[in-house]
UniProtKB/Swiss-Prot annotation:
Recorded superkingdom: Bacteria
Lineage: Bacteria, Bacillati, Actinomycetota, Actinomycetes, Kitasatosporales
Keywords, comma-separated and alphabetical: Ribonucleoprotein, Ribosomal protein
InterPro entries hit by this protein: Ribosomal_bL28/bL31-like_sf, Ribosomal_bL31, Ribosomal_bL31_B, Ribosomal_bL31_sf
Protein's name in the database: Large ribosomal subunit protein bL31B-1
Length: 91
């Protein structure tokens, strides 16, 4: 077997800047920035824009999407003018 084929797997801190939340895990991600963690050790830190602490799905602040169908929405806006309706049409 060939040696050194696997990427370096090491402890990394991921920091959610929006929520002010950070967690220590193991990853192959690298960074030049470091942070001192609660245990006194220094770890590389990777800043992320969104995590489970700030994502609307996990925080319960998700917007509800209108589930009305496109055909129903069209008919509501413009009315039903198909065959058999009172809207007229070709005679």
């Amino acid at each position: 077997m060939q040696q050194d084929k696997q990427p370096d797997y090491h402890p990394v801190v991921f920091r959610d800047r929006a929520a002010g939340y950070a967690f220590l895990t193991r990853s192959t991600a690298t960074s030049d920035k470091t942070i001192e963690w609660d245990d006194g050790e220094t770890y590389p830190v990777v800043d992320v824009e969104i995590s489970s602490e700030s994502h609307p799905f996990y925080t319960g602040k998700a917007r509800t999407v209108d589930s009305e169908g496109r055909i129903a929405q069209f008919e509501r806006r413009y009315g039903s003018t198909g065959p058999g309706s009172d809207g007229g049409g070709a005679a």
